[in-house]
Amino acid sequence: MLDLEKITLNVREIALRAGAFLRNERSGFDRSKVEKKNAHDYVSYVDKESERRIVAQLRELLPEAGFIAEEGSGSLTTENYCWLVDPLDGTTNFIHNNAPYCVSIALRNKEELLVGVVYEVCRDELYWTYKGAPSYLNNKEIHVSDVSDMDEAFVRSEEHTS
């Protein structure tokens, strides 16, 4: 049986290190090294290097797990445990030096999500949870609203443009 609390603690550290790498690379980012995956999707050397670092650390943490990663590390897997990794979620924002962009890491067992960590780099916000635990933002427990009437609800969304 996996110790999800311990795994989550490690994944939080991995996400923070990846975020520090993104922050450092953003200051000297070379836009000429950006590739187009398609008309509205980009990839940079920063995406690829961030993924390489994250995957290496996750392999050490849970060697038996497979990977599905945004930039192609690993492949679709039949393994029970599988890491889902987006090493730079918001590449277009990153390229244009706009917030937000983040590091997203999850662990699943078959179809069940076990761990989720999202680090929003620009705001220094670390969201995390694991199966059976509450959700947290920077170590403060957070909750969804109990408002069920949409007329009384406050809903916020950010447009994702290319």
Where are these regions (language model features)?
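Short, function-defining helix-loop hinge/capping sites that tune catalysis or transport
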Residues: V55, F94-N97, W128
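Acidic beta-strand-loop-alpha-helix segment within the catalytic core
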Residues: A106-S162
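Residues within alpha-helical transmembrane segments of multi-pass membrane proteins, especially transporters
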Residues: F21, S104-A106
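N-terminal subdomain of lithium-sensitive/metallo-dependent phosphomonoesterases centered on the IMPase/IPPase/PAP
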Residues: M1-L88
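Short loop/turn microsegments at loop-to-beta-strand junctions
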Residues: E79-W83, V103, L114
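Conserved structural elements of the adenylate-forming
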Residues: N98-C102
